[in-house]
Structure formats: structure tokens, C-alpha cells
């Protein structure tokens, strides 16, 4: 048996009457890795998380968790013991407004059975880790949503668990707070924690996950490293920004760029498109994903006088393409001009502020 496995789902299924919220999921999470659990709203992510937390019981299948060095099947008899090795943030945290973060952390440390004589020292460690010293003794009612989310994550790890489970930890947060939460998650990985993170934000997952599990309509449709998933995504999107281009000439500029890059994209003309995102001033080119084609496109744009100040293929863009292909019931995407506006709407919905 693999001693590195910390959580394992075996044929995990949850059925509500005739509806399968989760269907026959098999998944292993290894020690010290971040696994991103990705899917659109209603895909089955939260249901899976709640089964892991024993808030819902599986209709079929098993959950195995490592406790005291052994992988053990989760049941009503051992749930308190096994789940004590996991820190959960399943839903947006809600705290009494008139208490302080210090009191909240003391409460959760006691609730989780952390040694009484070590609680104060543990709280000081958490304060330093989350940079909470300026507001640890202030009343929570004055806090932003991002600050409350930090307290929620801090409460989840106050008892120093080996495994941390976070359900949509960045939902509803502003960009600054999302970056802070991302950095805290990476710090937790650095000190050896195993993290299972659900999200519908592709950009969030692509930045931090070692492996990505993609779920749709209750079915696990992919589980692999980001690099391997990207290799399977045959198409990619180049993002680039130009220096000082006139806004009024965008339409003619897009047409000209498309004529320049069409022979170099590695895909047929009817699939070619070039896009411009006005809010972020970012141009997009759809191509086959090969490094050589990417270089040829870059050189051709420079040769034709385009002054490029940024040029990249964001990981989130690659993951987005694969995700869209997998959840599309037809098994393919139409990237022709007739469907271009539809693609942009999906793009904006799935990757919020990717290029901010």
C-alpha cells in the first residue's frame, strides 16, 4: 500500500432520489501536494467535500483517510478520530461580530482537543503565519470578507492537522484578498501540509495546484498534473499587449493581425480567431499550442511593426480550453466567428479577472 496516500475516494457516489450529485469517483491525494478540485457550479464539488467531512453520507463507495500512520476507512465509529487530522473550511465562515479572532482561535483549539497548555503558543504561531497581529484583538464585526476568510482558514488549521480541505476559499473576495489567500495556501504546502482545494476559478487552481481533478455533472472527467493536462489540450490562447495602439483602429488591426498570423497558428482558417479585451487591453490569438508556432507568431508580429510589451500563454488559458472541451457535451468546441461572442461569454464567466 502506498504510504504517501493521505485521502482516497473509492467509487464514491451520492444520490438524491433519482439524481446523482456525485457518481463513482475514484481519487487519491498524496502527502504534501495541492490537489485542485475544479468544476462549474453544481458539478458536485461541495457534495464531495461534505461527504469527506462526514456531513453527508455516501450512497455508495468509501472514503479512506490516513490517521496514526494508517489509511483507514471513514465510518461513524472512527469519524471523530480520523477527521481530527483534517482542517475543514467547507462554507464561508460566519463569526459573532462582537468577538475577536483570538477568542475564535482559542475556541476552535479547545474544540479540537489541542493541549490546553500549548494553545496560547499555537495562537501566536498562527498570528505570525497569517500576519494577523494588527487585528487579532479587534472585534470581527469591523472586518472585511477577506479578513474573515483568513480567520476561517486559521481556525481550520489551529490544531495543526496534516490535511487541509478548502471549499471555494476565494469566492467573493477582491483581487488583493484572493492573492493573500493563495499565498497562505502555498505557505501551508511549504510546511508539508496536504491540501484539497475546490474552486470554479480556473486561474486560481492553475496557479497553485500540483494536480487537478475536473468534475462535471458528478463525474470525474480528468485527474492529472497540470503539465499533463496542458499536453492533452491541443489548442491554446496567446495573450499579448501592445504599446500605445490607437483604440479607434481596433477592428482593422484585428483583421490585419489575423492575416499575419493565420499561416502560423497551425490550425485551419475556419478555426482561427483574434480577439481584443477592451478592459485589460489584451489581444488574444488562438493557435495549436506548439512552442514553435508561438515563436513564429511573435516574430511575425514584431516584423510587421507591432510593438509588443507582453507576450505569453497563460496556464489558465490552457486549462480553460481543456476544461471547456471536456464539459462540452459534443466533445468539441466551435471556434469559428459565429460562435466567437459565445466563447467570450463563457471565458469571462469561467476565468474571473484572469488578466487583471
Predicted regions: what they are:
Residues 5-7, 14-197, 202-216, 222:
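ABC transporter nucleotide-binding domains
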Residues 131, 270-274, 307-312:
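A short linear hydrophobic-aromatic micro-motif
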Residues 289-356:
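C-terminal coupling/interaction segments
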Residues 182-284, 288:
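ABC transporter nucleotide-binding domain
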Residues 77, 96, 203, 221, ...:
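Short alpha-helical
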Residues 62-72, 256-264, 329-330:
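Short regulatory "switch" loops immediately downstream of catalytic or recognition motifs
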Amino acid at each position: 500500500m502506498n504510504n504517501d496516500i493521505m485521502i482516497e475516494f473509492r467509487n464514491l457516489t451520492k444520490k438524491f432520489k433519482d439524481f446523482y450529485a456525485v457518481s463513482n469517483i475514484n481519487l487519491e491525494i498524496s502527502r504534501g501536494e495541492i490537489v485542485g478540485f475544479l468544476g462549474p457550479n453544481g458539478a458536485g464539488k461541495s457534495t464531495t467535500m461534505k461527504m469527506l467531512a462526514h456531513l453527508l453520507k455516501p450512497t455508495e463507495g468509501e472514503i479512506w483517510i490516513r490517521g496514526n500512520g494508517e489509511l483507514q476507512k471513514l465510518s461513524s465509529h472512527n469519524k471523530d478520530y480520523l477527521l481530527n487530522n483534517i482542517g475543514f473550511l467547507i462554507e464561508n465562515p460566519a463569526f459573532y461580530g462582537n468577538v475577536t479572532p483570538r477568542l475564535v482561535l482559542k475556541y476552535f483549539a479547545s474544540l479540537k482537543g489541542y493541549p490546553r497548555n500549548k494553545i496560547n503558543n499555537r495562537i501566536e504561531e498562527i498570528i505570525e503565519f497569517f500576519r494577523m497581529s494588527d487585528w487579532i484583538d479587534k472585534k470581527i464585526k469591523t472586518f472585511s470578507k477577506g479578513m474573515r476568510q483568513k480567520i476561517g482558514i486559521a481556525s481550520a488549521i489551529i490544531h495543526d492537522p496534516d490535511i487541509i480541505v478548502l471549499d471555494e476559499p476565494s469566492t467573493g473576495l477582491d483581487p488583493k484578498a484572493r492573492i493573500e489567500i493563495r499565498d497562505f495556501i502555498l505557505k501551508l504546502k511549504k510546511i508539508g501540509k496536504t491540501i484539497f482545494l475546490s474552486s470554479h476559478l480556473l486561474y486560481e487552481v492553475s496557479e497553485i495546484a500540483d494536480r487537478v481533478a475536473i468534475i462535471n455533472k458528478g463525474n470525474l472527467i480528468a485527474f492529472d498534473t497540470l503539465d499533463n493536462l496542458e499536453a492533452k489540450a491541443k489548442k491554446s490562447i496567446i495573450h499579448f499587449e501592445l504599446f500605445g495602439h490607437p483604440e479607434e483602429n481596433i477592428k482593422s488591426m484585428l483583421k490585419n493581425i489575423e492575416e499575419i498570423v493565420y499561416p502560423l497558428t497551425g490550425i485551419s482558417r475556419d478555426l482561427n480567431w483574434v480577439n481584443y479585451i477592451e478592459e485589460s487591453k489584451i489581444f488574444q490569438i488562438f493557435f495549436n499550442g506548439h512552442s514553435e508556432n508561438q515563436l513564429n507568431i511573435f516574430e511575425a508580429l514584431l516584423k510587421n511593426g507591432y510593438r509588443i510589451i507582453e507576450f505569453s500563454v497563460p496556464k489558465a488559458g490552457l486549462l480553460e480550453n481543456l476544461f471547456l472541451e471536456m464539459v462540452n457535451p459534443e466533445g468539441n468546441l466551435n471556434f469559428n466567428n459565429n460562435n466567437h461572442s459565445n466563447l467570450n461569454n463563457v471565458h469571462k464567466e469561467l476565468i474571473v479577472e484572469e488578466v487583471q
